[in-house]
Amino acid sequence: MQRIKKGDKVVVITGKNKGGSGIVLKIMPARQQAIVEGLNKVTRHKKKDQTTKRAAKQSTGKVQQEAPIFLSKLALFDQKAKQQTIGKIKYVMDPKTNKKTRVFKKSNNTL
């Protein structure tokens, strides 16, 4: 079961981006990786594509973009407690809406 989902605030706990934080843009469950906003930037060299009509809208040259990071290098960030949590989450039924909500196990704050 995956504890990190799209839209979660995460912190990098190992690697060259250690200590950096951002919001998860995309999860790739088959590869166990995630793309985090503003982290793990790589440079791609893109040519101008002349075959499509969208060629004018595409950026060309050196383009900075986010590369995937393994989920094992990420930890959820509890914004209320201002600390990282290693994914211990429990689901609690919300009495008003009758839906499950994700709660940090350590601080009992909702995500």
Curated annotation (Swiss-Prot):
Annotated InterPro entries: KOW, Rib_uL2_dom2, Ribosomal_uL24, Ribosomal_uL24_CS, Ribosomal_uL24_KOW, Translation_prot_SH3-like_sf
Chain positions covered by the region annotation Disordered: 43-62
CDD domains, alphabetized: KOW_RPL26
SUBUNIT field: Part of the 50S ribosomal subunit.
GO molecular function: rRNA binding; structural constituent of ribosome
Gene name per UniProt: rplX
Protein name: Large ribosomal subunit protein uL24
Species: Mycoplasma pneumoniae (strain ATCC 29342 / M129 / Subtype 1) (Mycoplasmoides pneumoniae)
GO terms classed as biological process: translation
Function: One of two assembly initiator proteins, it binds directly to the 5'-end of the 23S rRNA, where it nucleates assembly of the 50S subunit. One of the proteins that surrounds the polypeptide exit tunnel on the outside of the subunit.
